[in-house]
């Protein structure tokens, strides 16, 4: 691999790490191993609470970032019905639980998703 000429690499961004933090860590590791500062950028951010593929471009491939950002993305989520947390995400422990016996797969699939461009699973 020639990181100076340019490479496109995909990493699995860890939970609680920012996209910039992940990029900085990879830059540090590559620069230390190669003996020179590696030019590196990412083709889109992920929330620190999200995990998933983060596309990194090095060297001359950083010029392709804008084009890579036009590609379709797919998101998946796991949720727990009948539970809340202080922050409404998994950053805090469950603080209240509610009955869920009335929630059926059909009800979930027929309930409109409130976020733009998202759809219920099939």
Give the label of every model feature segment:
Residues 1-122:
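Catalytic/RNA-binding core of pseudouridine synthases
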């Amino acid at each position: 691999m020639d990181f100076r000429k340019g490479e496109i690499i995909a990493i699995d961004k860890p939970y609680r790490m920012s996209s910039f933090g992940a990029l900085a860590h990879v830059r540090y590791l590559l620069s230390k191993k190669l003996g020179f500062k590696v030019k590196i950028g990412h083709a889109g951010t992920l929330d620190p609470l999200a995990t998933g593929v983060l596309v990194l471009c090095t060297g001359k491939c950083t010029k392709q970032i804008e084009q890579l950002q036009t590609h379709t993305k797919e998101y998946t989520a796991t949720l727990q019905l009948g539970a809340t947390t202080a922050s409404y995400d998994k950053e805090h422990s469950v603080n209240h639980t509610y009955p869920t016996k009335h929630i059926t797969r059909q009800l979930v699939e027929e309930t409109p998703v409130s976020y733009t461009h998202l759809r219920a699973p099939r």
